[in-house]
Structure formats: C-alpha cells, structure tokens
Amino acid sequence: MQAEFRRAKNSPQFFFSNAGMEEGNCREVAENCKKNLCSRGKSFTIVKGQSAGRNQVLGGRKRMSYVDEVLEKVVAKNPAEPEFHQAVKEVLESLRVVIEANEDKYRKEALLERLVEPERQIKFRVPWVDDAGQVQVNTGYRVQFNSAIGPYKGGLRLHPSVNLGIIKFLGFEQVFKNSLTGLPIGGGKGGSDFDPKGKSDREVMAFCQSFMTELCKYIGADTDVPAGDIGTGAREIGYLFGQYKRIKGLYEGVLTGKGLTYGGSLARTEATGYGLLYLTEEMLKINGKDIKGKTVAISGSGNVAIYATEKAQELGAKVVTASDSTGWVYDPEGIDVAALKEIKEVNRARLTEYKKYRPNSEYHEGRGVWSVKVDIALPCATQNELHLEDAKMLVENGCFAVAEGANMPTTLEATEYLQEKGVLFAPGKAANAGGVATSALEMSQNSERLSWTFEEVDARLKRIMVNICHNMADAAERYGMAGNYVAGANIAGFEKVVNAMEAQGIV
C-alpha cells in the first residue's frame, strides 16, 4: 500500500490521501516530503484531502479530477480550436486549488462545463462589393460567452487569422477580465476574417454595413455591446454604428469606442496606458514601494505605450525606452512624450526619427529593449515579446516589478521565472483592464444621456484600477498564495462569475 501526494499548481498546499495506509503513517511520510521540499526553498502546508492527485482513488478505482475531466471534454468537443484549448487550460490550471476545494459541489452543478461553453455562438456570411464591382464574401462571428454579471462586452477583431477558435479564446478571457473590473459587464467577442489593410474607405464601409446588417439582430445596449479591437478603429466603429442606427431606428449605446461627436467618452484613448500605471503604482504601494524616482522600461510606441509613458512621468518615474517593429530607443534623460506623439501620431514615422529630437538618445536596430538597467518593466507592444532570456536580463539588472500593458506579452516561461525570483508581476487581464473599464464608463454615460469631463472619467478609472489591484492581491492571499497576482487575478474574476451563475440557477 502507498500514499499519494500532489502539490496543487501555484499553491502552497500539499494534498495527501491515505489510500490503503494508516493516516498517521501517511501524514508522517507527507511531513518528510514537506521537509525535503522546504529545504529547497519551498514552503507548503499539509492538507488532508479526498484527492491525492489528479486521479482520485475511490473504491478501488481511479476517478479523474474534475479539472482534467473538463479539459478533456473541451478538447474532444472542440478539436480544431487549439487557441481555445490553451486559454481554458491556463485558466483552469491556475484555479485548481479553488476548484478542488469545492469539487463535489461544482461537479454536481456541472459548473465548469457551463463556464467553458458559450451561451451563444453566431456565425454568418458577410457579402460586400469591392471597388472593382466584384462581390466578396467573408465570415462573421459573435461569441456571446457569459452574461451572468451583465450584458456581453468585448471587441470586434478584423484580421485574416480570425476563426471561431480564436474568437472563443478571446471571449473566454474577456469574461474574467471584465469581471475583474467590478463593473456589471459580461464577456463576449466577435469579428471577421476581413482585412481592412489596403482597402479603400468605401470598401471598408461596404463590409461594415453588411456585417452590421446581420449582427444587429443579436446586439443591443442592454444585451451585447461590441467595441473596437485589432483592425477595428474609429472609422470602422463609425460605419458600424451608422448602419445599426439606420436599421434599428435607435440611437443607443450599442457600441463603445465611438467618436466624441456621437456618444464617445473622453479619456478612452488614454485609458489603457493610464490604467496600467494606476495599477502598477498601487501594486508597489501594497509592497511598500513608491513609483516616484524609479526608472522604467516600456516597449511599444502605440496608444498604450505613449500614454503609459505620459502617466509614469506624471507620477514621478523616468521612462527611458520606447520601441517599434524595427528597433528601440534608449533615452537616459527620459523619453520626450511630445516628440514620441509627433513621430507616431502625427508623422506616423519610425523611431529612427527620435534622435533628431533628442541628440543624446540612442537608437538600436532589432530587439533589446529589456537589456537596459531599470527598476520596472512594462511590456506594451505585442504578444510574447518578453522571453525567458529577457526576464533573466531584467532580474540581473535589478528589475523588481513587471506589469503587462499588452495582451499576453510575457511568455509562460518568462512569467514563471520572474515569479520564482520574487519579481512583482501583474498579468495583462488585470493590468490592461483600463480600456474595457472605460468602455463600460462610456456605456454608463450613454445610458444617462450625459457626457462626463476628462477628469471625472480619469478619476473613476483610477478607482477601478486600484480596486482591481486589491481584489487580486486579496484573492491570492486568501488561498495562501500572497504575492501571486496571476493566480489572484484569475481567482478574483472566477469567483464573481461563478457566484452569479450559482445565484441565477441552471440557465
């Protein structure tokens, strides 16, 4: 006979079961295992559980853990959707300690099965006529994932890579991101394989009008409120809103990211970058540090990076880097935000131009933005831009905090390394939630037929980001994972959605 042991991922709890073994002997072995692990710098508590591993021993036969059972079902049911598989796996694995504490209850209610299955998946054709008079046909999608805490909310992505699996992956992530804001918004996502690049304004308008002609049947200010995303900017939102109003005869807040002349919100452009700094500042405060006087490396030179740089310098930090697809800039005196805006927003030029404004700066081709000695790193450029080697350089150079401004800019290996080395790490679903939070504030203004000042929106945004920071910190601490903000963000988002689902019954 032997006991089985397992440490739940991202948890200091060490579960054991005494299958066929006296409990006293089993615990003695468990304590020896604990001593061995603690001698290697690990810290655990011993917890007697019904399950010792992912395969539970029940009545002489093994039963798969609920998390693994659901993961297998997701893959079997959605075989051609690897992005969706990955998203579900990453979230459920980080929630294992929470799910296992309530496994019997969740299994009986099929709660995870309901959580990973969208409430509605809409797929439709989008015919439109190009400038040459040729009819083109694209595919449109809207996945309304979960409305337990409010109307579906999530962007519309226009890119050739878009398919149902990607939209489901994005929609699933959006559920937890929106929940974290504390605002009454559910999760959804949509889009099409249409590529607006290289298309004339007339062609983009033709596509958007055709797309909305079908989509308008499923959305509304209190039902589903789409927004912009990759490929969907102010131009596209305008065309979509115009067609909705034309068909429905309603002037309502059915889309966010609108222009200021027809219901948009002030501070929306700045929201993600400003929100990133509000959360970073609060995370440092919780850990007894101050952002004032710190040096910061920021990647990217788009909206998020520009306004993160602006707010960081307002808070007394010094941002010394910026980057684009061709290279990066190091300015030891601090990035000139006005110059950066002129280069990127006005001239739409490359960062090679920056040296004309700041002769003492350095321009470097290719990668390398994370090689600079800084206190704080804020990746704001693109997915998987910060690799394991970059993380090692940051740690070696004394970086003590990383917060994600882009969506998943840090690889899994880099994230794990940073956490192991004690670097404060704020995941994107929390750190870059300022954009969706301000979209929800736009919905509120539209509902009230009011337009708030920039200062009012900014103050509300700051409160939301500070609350997100405390919610993820508190959730991590409740489950014995103090300082693990990745787990904390997932737990905080999960608990709110699950509690709402349970309260509303089997629907």
Can you name each region flagged by the protein language model?
Residues D68-E72, K89, L164, K168-F172, ...:
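Predominant activation on well-ordered alpha-helical scaffold segments within soluble catalytic domains
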Residues Q13, S17, E31-K34, C38-R54, ...:
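Short, positively charged and aromatic/hydrophobic N-terminal segments
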Residues S65-A87, M283, V395-V507:
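Adenosine-phosphate binding glycine-rich loop
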Residues T223-A227, L250-L255, I298, T321-D324, ...:
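General beta-strand structural signal in soluble alpha/beta enzymes
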Residues R63-L266, K496-I506:
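N-terminal ligand-binding/catalytic initiation module
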Residues G327-F425, A430:
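Rossmann-like adenosine-cofactor binding region
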Residues Q2-F5, S11, M21-A30, K34-L37:
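Cationic, amphipathic, low-complexity segments that mediate targeting or membrane/lipid association
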